[in-house]
Amino acid sequence: LKCKKLVPLFSKTCPAGKNLCYKMFMVAAPHVPVKRGCIDVCPKSSLLVKYVCCNTDKCN
């Protein structure tokens, strides 16, 4: 699985066990990602922070 890094032009191959790509952003600014990368379990979103997870190459 390949996931985008914070700079969308770059991607990285996920290590074993981390089979989800995620994008984290502030609810107040939904079009500005704060973090991107590989993760094993999708974190729960909160009132301030939203997580979007997916399991295909560069879907974040």
Swiss-Prot record:
Q: Keyword check for Membrane, yes or no.
A: yes
Its keywords, alphabetically, are: Cardiotoxin, Cytolysis, Disulfide bond, Membrane, Secreted, Target cell membrane, Target membrane, Toxin
Give the tissue specificity: Expressed by the venom gland.
Q: What GO terms describe the biological role, i.e. biological process, of this protein?
A: killing of cells of another organism
Q: Name one Pfam family in it.
A: Toxin_cobra-type
GO cellular component terms listed in the entry, alphabetical order: extracellular region; membrane; other organism cell membrane
**Its biological purpose:** This three-finger cytotoxin is a basic protein that interacts and penetrates into the cell membrane, with the tips of all the three loops. Cytotoxins which have a Pro-30 (P-type) interacts with membrane stronger that those which have a 'Ser-28' (S-type). CTII interacts with membrane stronger than CTI.
Q: What is the designated name of this protein?
A: Cytotoxin 2
